[in-house]
Swiss-Prot record:
NCBIfam families: PRK00405.1, rpoB. This is DNA-directed RNA polymerase subunit beta. The gene is rpoB. Residues 1185-1236 are annotated as: Disordered. It comes from the Bacteria. Its EC number is 2.7.7.6. Residues 1201-1220 have a biased composition (Acidic residues). The keyword Nucleotidyltransferase applies. Belongs to the RNA polymerase beta chain family. It comes from Clostridium tetani (strain Massachusetts / E88). The RNAP catalytic core consists of 2 alpha, 1 beta, 1 beta' and 1 omega subunit. When a sigma factor is associated with the core the holoenzyme is formed, which can initiate transcription. It catalyses: RNA(n) + a ribonucleoside 5'-triphosphate = RNA(n+1) + diphosphate. GO terms for molecular function: DNA binding; DNA-directed RNA polymerase activity; ribonucleoside binding. One of its GO terms (biological process) is DNA-templated transcription.
Length: 1236
């Protein structure tokens, strides 16, 4: 039943039935851990891979010995970086050793290798002052993949692909004649036997001897016209290098460099792990009948007799005794199964080798050689260390290739299985660390080329490491990654939840991933392996659906990049569900039966029911309780954080839940945040991990609290003194222009622990996420103002500032050097009256606190005009008045159209103060304008269940429907928005909200484990309401009751970032496009509304000829006509006849460009001369109604947000996650040095 739960400083009444067994880990650890790995191991791996760099003679060799990030010399703090548009980074120092092998001379030096961007505690990077997030990428894991397709007759054809991390692909395929072909690196196909001959077994006999008798192999050999190893090598060389003279040696070295050279072919740790897992012998021989006695080669004892079934443990024992091929008996034939010769080192080396840190299987022949030649423990360890790259090879080896062929031969007989490429066991994450590592590797390999060249050119004796190394390629590739990679995105900072979600996002796009166009339905679809790893609900609508996902709440990423999810182990002996938590990847989970988290348990932890519903891969089965292997840890395990914040999610249709998840991320932080009455209990965790709240670093006592600072005296003083200071952010601008403001929660004398929340941030209330407001509402129509999801709101919401938010915009002006002299920031602006300068100080910059409207001057700036040859009089004036009379024009920064507000901050950067400015800039001024935006007609609002709508009317409070106790409703929603959309969760939320508000509760109803219908009825009755949650409503205008009782209660409603003030737009005259001379389009360009083809039809249909003519000419692109019209309107005369539209001239020119002789004739068939340029007719006007095409409103720095908003409205299927970085598509590195 309902029970109190302490969440931070608030007590919630929880309806959950299931006790939490597993702590949710830090929600942004996927970012933090990955970057930490990169600093500790990732960088070292790259240096190890490239060591040593030798010149072409092999005489000089350059080695990277070690590296460190110089944390002492970080130039600016995070806050300063944001202010100064700098990058938050630390200098990377690498110690380099240069060895001259002829003279034996060794030189060591520390080389500076550029500033390396650091991750902030929040899991973000500050790049050029903008906060960015690196999104994790979901890619296909390297490994061996088998696939099956059917030919025309319905026969199964098996194919395989061997995919490395980088390097040449191997593909096998079978045709209808049972011949197996191979393609090497996407070339034309060859019979498989050619590859086998070239690698090892030259003659037909050897091949059959090795692989065993098989019809398909024999058919392939027949097809093959080579008979020896040499012929096969030449054949392959001809295919791979057509046109070059083939020789056996060059063919050998070609194959060697294609597959067996670690520099060219890299499997990576994951690849090796997946290869060994797929090609392991024991998986294919388990549960098969042995066709002969299997003898352990070391002891000589028989492990399995002929005709005996090989069980799983025996199979593993056989593999780990070094046996690599086993014959198994099928119905009417014997099949040979060949592994890839990798074994568990622990079954051979009996002493402790944990310090060697070997987690993978090792290559048996190499290990055997070491063990045969050495017996001493230390020597064996030494040899293992020395040969680690042969024991665990980074590239593919012959044994791997032979094993993949053997697997292909066994598939038609049901030995082995085909793979599903959308399974999360075959897709992995590249997080920040790995993406950075790959980028760094590209930079280093470019640098390596430079070093080699310099080694050969420079004088061998005077050479130093510093002189050899050019760090430009390295710093450039890092800069390129952070600045323009598709995966480095401008952080979505609308509210704490959107920040958190952005850091937990998984994208299948980006370099080396999929492209939107190529991605089919299967990749985007929900897969059974997503359970507990990736949210099936949260994904954008539009072209990116299913390609961009969100990490589930409990998911973790393992060392190989596979996503794991926790399960509770069921003790098979006693039937008890233990508290042992085991994290499993998707392919491990496939072997087990897993019970749901809400399965009821006895007090001793055993299942109550005898039959249990379990998941088995994609099926749901009912099995006896003895067969269950694991159990989910929590019902919210399968969804993401945003989805877990929707109460009664189980009662909503999935597509509406998707909208609900996505719209919570667009909620604007309000002036007075208010936590939801009906929450799910995850609000506190989400807020604490989203990094918008200051948390205590060490336990202690609060000694000082002000609006901007909190000081905590630590219980145990350490090297940083005994007081921790926490600076609070006050009215800062977020990336999206919302307001970031923190206010203290603790008071003087409070005791705090580690991680105690000290202050509330934007959209948080007592440390819980608070995106919206609890609003008293009813499902009732009102005079048609609810039509099509519109919302009717009470004036109270405007008056009481319930939905008021603060928005801060940033504008900047820079004074540059021009060809004609420097620009100047000054109060002295030509042709501007004193009235316009009333709020401008003596520097020419607006004062803080001034109220500004559109068109007001923010920064006065003048630019020198082109000087003409001066006359004698002018020269005299110059001599008398000095420079004052110089020709300048006004280029001041003004408030753009439709913007207004109060100046809250002004920052000035100059060269004299030692600020770093971009070249040619002498002074930079930034102004911040804040606006309070009250809720108004046209704003978009939404609940948490995908029930969105636009405000249609603000009604006086006294006209709103009111309850029997006299309280008026605050919002009326349309009841028709519920049944067809099937998001019943909103109705249950309203009922529970009504009861909870009366009882004074805040409730938690976790997803899939929340309040049931009887519980809600009980709560309503406890609060003194009817069990159905309906009540009589009275019309506010007449006082009469409405005919039927109405559902009334409290719903949590959000105000979304689509505000009408940002969208409304009007234009009289403005900029025109250069070629067609038609007005530009869009708010950002201050454009006009297009009167398009269909609108023209409408006017034609009405026969409105004159209206149509002026719309197509003087109102659009008749250049002369529109100027004359403007003049006529100003002078009050009649509007003149229109001329020829510019676009008509363009059309004629286009036809002439196609070599068509086009003339324009009048009624009498006389040619009309069309003037090329309208300048002859141009009337000199006082008014400039022209604007140049490149006119745009002054841009806010790092903020393409307005345009994004603009495009959101243009496309109905707008994609929320298409970051504006996608504009830099052209710069993509298509893959990591990889042709595929």
């Amino acid at each position: 039943m309902v029970h109190p739960v302490q969440v931070g400083k608030r007590t919630r009444m929880s309806f959950s039935k299931i006790k939490e067994v597993c702590e949710m880990s830090n929600l942004i650890e996927v970012q933090l851990d990955s970057y930490e790995w990169f600093l500790q191991e990732g960088l070292q791996e790259v240096f190890d891979d490239i060591n040593p760099i030798q010149d072409y003679t092999g005489n000089l060799s350059l080695e990277f010995v070690g590296y460190k990030l110089d944390m002492e010399n970080i130039k600016y703090s995070v806050e300063e970086c944001k202010e100064r548009d700098a990058t938050y980074a630390a200098p990377l120092k690498v110690s380099v050793r240069l060895i001259n092998k002829e003279t034996g001379e060794i030189k060591e030096q520390d080389v500076f290798m550029g500033d390396f961007p650091l991750m902030t505690e929040q899991g973000t990077f500050i790049i050029n002052g903008a906060e960015r997030v690196i999104v994790s990428q979901l890619v296909r894991s390297p490994g061996v993949y088998y696939d099956v397709s059917l030919d025309k007759s319905g026969k199964e054809l098996f194919s395989a692909t061997v995919i490395p991390n980088r390097g040449a692909w191997l593909e096998y395929e079978t045709d209808s004649n049972d011949i197996i072909y191979v393609r090497i690196d996407k070339t034309r196909k060859l019979p498989i036997s050619i590859l086998i001959r070239a690698l090892e077994y030259g003659s037909d006999l050897e091949i059959i001897d090795y692989f065993g008798e098989d019809e398909r192999l024999k058919a392939s050999i027949e097809k093959d016209n080579t008979k020896t190893k040499e012929e096969a090598l030449l054949e392959i060389y001809k295919r791979l290098r057509p046109g070059e003279p083939p020789t056996v040696d060059s063919a050998m070295s070609l194959i060697g460099s294609l597959f067996f050279d670690a520099k060219r072919y890299d499997l990576s740790r994951v690849g090796r792990y997946k290869f060994n897992k797929k090609l392991a012998l024991h998986l294919r021989i388990a549960n098969q009948i042995s066709a002969q006695d299997i003898v352990n080669p070391a002891t000589g004892e028989i492990v399995v007799q002929e005709g005996e079934k090989i069980d799983r443990d025996k199979a593993i024992e056989i593999q780990n005794s070094g046996i690599n091929s086993v014959d198994i008996q099928l119905d009417d034939k014997v099949l040979r199964v060949i592994g890839n010769n990798f074994v568990d080192i622990k079954s051979f080396v009996k002493f402790d080798i944990d310090d060697l840190n070997i987690k993978e299987y090792v290559h048996y022949p190499t290990l055997k050689e070491i063990l045969d030649n050495y017996s001493d423990e230390e020597m064996i360890k030494e040899q293992i260390k020395k040969n680690i790259n042969v024991l665990i090879p980074k590239h593919i080896i012959r044994d791997d290739i032979m094993s993949t062929i053997s697997y292909e031969i066994g598939l038609p007989y049901g030995i082995g299985y085909t793979d599903d490429i959308d399974h999360l066991g075959n897709r992995r994450l590249r997080s920040v660390g790995e993406l950075l590592q790959n980028q760094f590797r590209i930079g280093l390999s470019r640098m390596e080329r430079v070093v080699k060249e310099r080694m050969t050119i420079q004088d061998q004796d005077s050479i130093t490491p510093q002189a050899l190394i050019n760090i430009r390629p390295v710093t450039a590739s890092i800069k390129e990654f952070f600045g323009s990679s598709q995966l480095s995105q401008f952080m979505d900072q609308t509210n704490p939840l959107s920040e958190l979600t952005h850091k937990r996002r998984l994208s299948a796009l980006g370099p080396g991933g999929l492209s939107r166009e190529r991605a089919g339905f299967e990749v985007r679809d929900v897969h059974h392996s997503h359970y507990g790893r990736m949210c099936p609900i949260e994904t954008p609508e539009g072209p990116n659906i299913g390609l961009i996902n969100s990490l589930a709440t409990y998911a973790k990423v393992n060392e190989y990049g596979f996503i794991e999810t926790p399960y509770r182990k069921v003790d098979k002996a006693t039937g008890v569900v233990t508290h042992d938590i085991i994290y499993m990847t998707a392919d491990e989970e496939d072997h087990y039966l897993i019970a749901k988290a809400n399965e009821i348990l006895n007090d001793d932890g055993t299942f109550i029911d005898d039959k249990i519903t379990v998941r088995d891969q994609e099926d749901v089965l009912v099995v006896p309780k003895e067969e269950v292997d694991f159990m989910d840890v929590s019902p919210r395990q399968l969804v993401s954080v945003a989805t877990a914040m929707i109460p009664f999610l189980e009662n909503d249709d999935a597509s509406r839940a998707l909208m609900g998840s996505n719209m919570q991320r667009q909620a604007v932080p309000l002036l007075k945040p208010e936590a939801p009455i009906v929450g799910t209990g995850i609000e506190y965790k989400a807020a604490v991990d989203s990094a918008v709240l200051p948390k205590a670093k060490k336990p202690g006592v609060v000694t000082y609290v002000s609006a901007s600072e909190i000081r905590v005296k630590k219980d145990k003083p350490d090297s940083n003194g005994d007081v921790d200071k926490y600076k609070l952010l006050k009215f800062k601008r977020s990336n999206q222009g919302t307001c970031i403001n923190q206010k203290p929660l603790v008071s003087k004398g409070d005791k705090v622990d580690t991680k105690t929340v000290l202050a509330d941030g934007p959209s948080t209330d007592l440390g819980e996420i608070a995106l919206g407001k609890n609003i008293r509402m009813g499902f009732i129509t009102w005079e048609g103002y609810n039509y099509e999801d519109a919302m009717l709101i009470s004036e109270e919401l405007v008056r009481e500032d319930v939905f008021t938010s603060i928005h801060i915009e940033e504008y900047e002006a820079e004074a540059r050097d021009t060809k004609l002299g420097p620009e100047e920031i000054t109060r002295d602006i030509p042709n501007v009256g004193e009235d316009a300068l009333k709020d401008i100080d003596e520097r020419g910059i607006i004062r803080i606190g001034a109220e500004v409207r559109s068109g007001d001057i923010l920064v006065g700036k003048v630019t020198p005009k082109g000087e003409t040859e001066l006359t004698a009089e002018e020269r005299l004036l110059r001599a008398i008045f000095g420079e004052k009379a110089r020709e300048v024009r006004d280029t001041s920064l003004r408030v753009p159209h439709g913007e207004a507000g109060i100046i809250v901050d002004v920052k000035v950067f100059t060269r004299e103060n030692g600020d770093e400015l971009s070249p040619g800039v002498n002074k930079l001024v930034r102004c911040y304008i804040a606006q309070k935006r009250k809720i108004s007609v046209g704003d978009k609002m939404a609940g948490r269940h995908g029930n969105k709508g636009v405000i249609s009317r603000v009604l006086p409070e006294e006209d709103m429907p009111f309850l029997p106790d006299g309280r008026p409703l605050q919002i009326c929603l349309n009841p028709l928005g519920v049944p067809s959309r099937m998001n019943i969760g909103q109705v249950l939320e309203v009922h529970l909200g009504l009861a909870a508000s009366k009882l004074g509760w805040h409730v938690a109803t976790p997803v899939f484990d929340g309040a049931t219908e009887p519980e809600i009825v009980e709560c309503l009755e406890k609060a003194g309401y009817e069990g159905d949650g309906k009540t009589v409503l009275y019309d506010g205008r007449t006082g009469e009751p409405f005919d039927n009782r109405v559902t009334v209660g409290y719903m949590y409603i959000l105000k979304l970032a689509h505000l009408v003030d940002d969208k409304i737009h009007a234009r009289s005259t403005g900029p025109y496009s250069l070629v067609t001379q038609q007005p530009l389009g869009g708010k950002a360009q201050f454009g006009g509304q297009r009167f398009g083809e269909m609108e023209v039809w409408a006017l034609e249909a009405y026969g409105a000829a004159h209206t149509l003519q002026e719309i197509l000419t003087v109102k659009s692109d008749d250049v002369v006509g529109r100027v004359k019209t403007y003049e006529a309107i100003v002078k009050g005369e009649n509007i003149p006849e229109p001329g020829v539209p510019e676009s008509f001239k363009v059309l004629i020119k286009e036809l002439q460009a196609l070599c068509l002789d086009v003339k324009v004739l009048n009624d009498d068939n006389e040619e009309i001369a069309i003037k090329e340029l309208a300048d002859d007719d141009m009337v000199e006007l006082e008014v400039n109604i022209e604007g140049s095409e490149d006119y745009t409103e002054p841009k806010q720095p790092n903020d393409n947000y307005l345009e994004e908003e603009e495009n959101k409205d243009k496309e109905s299927d707008y994609d929320e996650d298409l970051n504006f970085d996608d504009l830099t598509k052209g710069l993509q590195l298509d893959d990591f040095n990889d042709e595929h």
